[in-house]
Regions:
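C-terminal segment of N-terminal export signals and the immediately downstream linker at the start
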Residues: 29-57
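Histidine-anchored nucleotide/phosphate-binding helix
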Residues: 70-87
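Acidic helix-start/capping segments at beta-turn-to-alpha-helix junctions
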Residues: 87-111
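Glycine-rich, aromatic-bearing surface loops/beta-hairpins
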Residues: 175-224
Length: 224
């Protein structure tokens, strides 16, 4: 088997396993629309997030720890390129690339509640002083710009990408805490991604593939 054929088979296998896991939990959460809407298995699927970046200026923001910084930087890039450099917003494409703890920002409220992610990530809901049972990044955060949220940035064309290796790691860690079987937890996570999120086999390989196609790279993780 040639390298290209082997690569195609591997991609089909990844996407088929993902679709099975998500379909098995369709009653618990929403399957990411980009994965559900397109036929699975085509070699281009793993690069679908790159394909949608058609502007003259394209950049990916890599975040591992502090997800909020990627939201603020996405907002600032779009605003400042438009207001200070005269670049039409449609010509400035931003992709937020997440792995590690940062993937919490792209998991829906149902998964936060079902898997007790607030307790796992040590996120406290200020209104209850208890572990959070919802994803705070989906609505305006006190003290932050009201438009620095995942839905608002998606509306402005920002692409959000999650690493599947990180999802597998998280599922194993939650299972080790007594949360259930790792494969079942993974299925919940995959089905519970915020609709519109792209799940890629490996984040670093995906970023390298994007750089090869001319997408700039910025590391946006910092204390905030």
């Amino acid at each position: 088997m040639s390298d290209s054929n082997a690569s195609s088979v591997a991609r089909r296998g990844f996407l088929f396993r993902l679709s099975q896991a998500a379909a098995g939990l369709a009653g618990l959460a929403v399957v990411p629309k980009e994965l559900a809407a397109e036929p699975l298995g085509a070699p281009a699927d793993v690069d679908a997030w790159i394909d949608r970046m058609k502007g003259q200026h394209r950049v990916m923001l890599h975040v591992h720890q502090n997800f909020i910084t990627s939201l603020l930087d996405s907002r600032n890039l779009l605003n400042n390129s438009r207001d200070l450099y005269g670049v039409p917003e449609a010509q400035y494409n931003v992709a937020v690339m997440t792995h590690g703890p940062a993937i919490q920002g792209l998991l829906g409220d149902d998964v936060w509640r079902q898997l007790a992610l607030g307790e796992y990530y040590k996120v406290t809901d200020k209104s209850t002083n208890a572990p959070a049972v919802r994803n705070a990044f989906l609505t305006p955060i006190e003290g932050e710009p009201a438009d620095a949220t995942v839905p608002e940035l998606m509306r402005r064309g920002v692409t959000f990408v999650v690493c599947n290796v990180a999802m597998r790691t998280l599922s194993k860690r939650l299972a080790a805490r007594g949360g259930g079987e790792a494969d079942a937890i993974y299925g919940q996570l995959a089905a519970g991604l915020v609709p519109g999120t792209f799940l890629v086999p490996d984040l670093f390989v995906s970023m390298q593939r994007a750089q090869k196609r001319g997408v700039a790279y910025l590391f946006t993780d910092r204390a905030h």
